[in-house]
Amino acid sequence: MGDTDLPCVTGVLLAAGAGKRLGRGPKALLPYRGRTLVEDAAETMLVGGCHEVVIVLGANAQAVCARANLEPYRIVVNHDWSSGMGSSYLAGDAAAHTKNHILVALVDQPGLSVTTVGRLLVSHRPGRISSAAYSSLDSPRVLRRGHPMVIDAGLRPAVASTVSGDAGARVFLRQKPWLVDLIDCSDESTGEDVDTVEQMYRLL
């Protein structure tokens, strides 16, 4: 499949969290590769093949916009961010054109690469969800579903109807596992996100 055959995809970058456990302010502003996590992730999604990127901000949204260069992207502010990731998912989904697939990524997953994004887009099949998956040292043959993931345009309303609280698309994925294609991205990343101070210092 050539680049011109790729589906029209809106990247949705969930970046609304406050990062309270880390004590460093929003995770979006953590330093990474000489800039912020949100800048790195958004550019990776765009270069990887997304036609546009919608960044969903929440906690300290004004500070994030002031400190990060987000001009190439569309910004959506989720004022209900404290209710959980579900509200941010819905805000990003609503901002994307209804005919577009969406590629959902998390700002606190620094292992996101251009190769991973491109691999998911090329692998995507109509009417399905393509999810990055990662092996672990304990079970290298077992793939663990993670982010990012491509959600087909035709499935977006059904997925959105199941979203609440902090679950995001998790409920739908558990209800309809036969619609999910796991795409092995273990060669690019462990799929871990930044939740602890130890992980943060490894990032720095």
Swiss-Prot record:
Pfam families, per the entry: NTP_transf_3
Gene3D superfamilies: Spore Coat Polysaccharide Biosynthesis Protein SpsA, Chain A
Database matches in CDD domains: GT_2_like_f (cd04182)
GO molecular function, one term: oxidoreductase activity
EC numbers for this chain: 1.1.1.328
NCBIfam families attached to this UniProt entry: NicBOxredNboR
Function summary: Catalyzes the reduction of nicotine blue to its hydroquinone form. Nicotine blue is the name given to the compound formed by the autocatalytic condensation of two molecules of 2,3,6-trihydroxypyridine, an intermediate in the nicotine degradation pathway. May play a role in preventing the intracellular formation of nicotine blue semiquinone radicals, which by redox cycling would lead to the formation of toxic reactive oxygen species. Besides nicotine blue, several other quinones are reduced by nboR.
Name of the protein this chain belongs to: Nicotine blue oxidoreductase
Organism: Paenarthrobacter nicotinovorans (Arthrobacter nicotinovorans)
Gene giving rise to this polypeptide: nboR
